[in-house]
């Protein structure tokens, strides 16, 4: 699956700078050694957006309380878009007031998502528009007033990982060292023994 820099950890910058097909590693990643090949780089492949859903009677997932027609929903969506574009407007508050969607109580926040996570028309809008863009998109759920909040690049890696497990000899050596340390601390105490180590 595609990953953002934040998901990759210590070597994220190095992995993001690879050319497609290039290999990096081996490198230590937590309890694993990995070798990774960059399979694909998708600029802006993860988008953060929020929306206000204006449903209409007969739209998918519309509750029984929705009585507006499709035309009324379209007009309402463009009214909300004008309000969202107005100076001093608060998109989150508009979502709480106007949205029929499940993200209403979160101010319309959808967080980050990757290509294909949303229905096609919604997906096409957010991935083709610049950060800060506002617009109305029609889907089977109704009319969405959408704001593109942020974009992140993502990479697709093919990795081979091997868990780091100490050998029996290493485990025995650590045990012997710890036992020797314990015995040498004796009456002088832990502090003087630790300084000697």
Residues covered by each model-derived region:
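Soluble sensory domains of the PAS superfamily and closely related sensory modules
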Residues: 15-19, 126-130
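PAS and PAS-like sensory modules
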Residues: 23-26, 134-136
């Amino acid at each position: 699956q595609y990953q953002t820099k934040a998901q990759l950890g210590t070597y994220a910058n190095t992995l993001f700078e690879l050319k497609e097909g290039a290999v990096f590693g081996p490198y230590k990643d937590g309890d694993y050694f990995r070798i990774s090949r960059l399979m694909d780089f998708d600029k802006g492949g993860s988008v953060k957006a929020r929306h206000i859903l204006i449903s209409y009677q007969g739209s998918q997932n519309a509750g029984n309380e929705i009585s507006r027609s499709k035309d009324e929903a379209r007009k309402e969506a463009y009214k909300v878009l004008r309000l969202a574009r107005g100076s001093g407007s608060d998109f989150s508050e508009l979502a709480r007031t106007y949205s029929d969607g499940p993200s209403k109580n979160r101010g319309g926040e959808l967080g980050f998502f990757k290509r294909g996570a949303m229905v096609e028309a919604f997906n096409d809008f957010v991935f083709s528009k610049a950060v800060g863009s506002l617009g109305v998109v029609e889907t089977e759920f109704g009319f969405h007033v959408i704001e593109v909040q942020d974009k992140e690049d993502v990479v697709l890696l093919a990795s081979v990982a091997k868990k780091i497990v100490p050998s029996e000899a290493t485990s025995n050596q650590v045990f012997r060292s710890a036992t020797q340390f314990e015995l040498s601390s004796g009456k002088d105490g832990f502090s003087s023994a630790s300084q000697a180590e």
